[in-house]
C-alpha cells in the first residue's frame, strides 16, 4: 500500500495510546504522527484510559500490559464488558514488553484484537492498525466478554500450534 494512501487512511483516526512510560508514549506518538496520524491522545494509567475512552471516543486504543492503578488486562476486561462499558467493540492493540505465550493468550482471550512487542517498528504498528481498523474481524460474545472472532487457521497450522 502506498505511503500517501496509508497516511490518508490514518489521518482521520482518533488514537489513544496508554502506557505508564512517558518515553514509550512519546515514541509511539512519533511513529503514529510519521505514519499520518493526526489525533493522538495519551493516558498514563488504566483509570485515565477509561476516562479518555468515555470522553474522547477514540477509534482505536494501543494499551500497555503492565501499568499501575489498573493494568492493561484489567482495562481490557472492563472495556469488553457489554452493558458495563459504552464501547465494548473498541479496537485494541495490546503492547507487551515480553512475548510470553501465557500473556499473549490471556490478552487475546480477554478481547485484544492484536498485540505488539515493545518497542515496535513503524511497519508493524501500521500493519496492525490497518488490520484492526480497516479489515476488522466480527465481534462475538465469549462468556461475559465481547471479543474479536478467533482467526481461522488452516489444518497444518493448527496442528503445529498444538505441538
Mark where each language-model region is.
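Receiver (REC) domain active-site loop signature in two-component systems and cognate sites
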Residues: 67
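CheY-like receiver
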Residues: 6-8, 130-163
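Active-site residues of response regulator receiver
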Residues: 64, 96
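Short amphipathic alpha-helix used as the core "switch/output" element in two-component signaling
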Residues: 51, 73-87
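Helix N-cap/capping motif at the beta->alpha junctions
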Residues: 42-51, 72
